[in-house]
Amino acid sequence: MAVKRSTRLGCNECSEINYLTFKNVKKNPEKLALNKFCSRCRKVVLHKEVKRK
């Protein structure tokens, strides 16, 4: 069975956490980075995986 863990994506410019997604930790051990819309910046910017607390 695949191990999927929830990950949070934070804006690279304003550091706000905007998205929650799931990824397979065994297949993709590196950090996730996606271009997404930030409602605070009001533009499409890079969102990177934020460290879990």
Curated annotation (Swiss-Prot):
The keyword Hydrolase does not apply. Keywords: Ribonucleoprotein, Ribosomal protein. Transmembrane segments: none annotated. GO terms for cellular component: cytoplasm; ribonucleoprotein complex; ribosome. GO terms for biological process: translation. It comes from the Bacteria. Disulfide bonds: none annotated. GO terms for molecular function: structural constituent of ribosome. InterPro entries: Ribosomal_bL33, Ribosomal_bL33_CS, Ribosomal_bL33_sf, Ribosomal_zn-bd. Belongs to the bacterial ribosomal protein bL33 family. This is Large ribosomal subunit protein bL33A. It comes from Mycoplasma genitalium (strain ATCC 33530 / DSM 19775 / NCTC 10195 / G37).
